[in-house]
Amino acid sequence: MKYDVTRLVLVGLVSGLRSQLGVAAVALTTEAGESARPASLFAGVWGKRGAAAGAVGELVADKLPWTPSRLTPAGVASRMAFGGFAAVALASREPDGAPPALAAAVGAAASAVGTLAGAYWRRTAAEAGRPDWPAALLEDAAALLLAGTAVGHTDAARRAVAGAGRTASGALAGALSPSPGRG
């Protein structure tokens, strides 16, 4: 049997960028009558609210100066766990979805890649002397777009990213424009 692992890779990448967002994307798009486990955990209002609260909390906490690096062993492991879980939940919603072990492996591996890519992006911006917050907002926008694509809601993702993009692009333009005396 063939499995389309593209969406599993995307939801894993999202979890590497923002650990809670992959699970939240799956939760918020799970139908109320879903009975397949583990997606059924998100079929009720409390599952959706809990996942959304975790994602919003992380989007805010990521910008705080005392937030630890995602590259700590605990940070990488938790992102891989969230990526694996999000991929398993996503696959469980589909009649011909990948088996749980395959979905977990794909989601966790993609999450590791997303973790490293996000850290590289933020470090590159910092090394260029740019403030962190515009890079963080652009990373948020990329994660939201990938999340929407992973769960099959590309129009909603585009609208969310457009709003975030307008804010981030204005901030980024100001942060990237040369200041006096800075070549």
Model regions: which residues?
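Short amphipathic, positively biased membrane-proximal segments
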Residues: 1-183
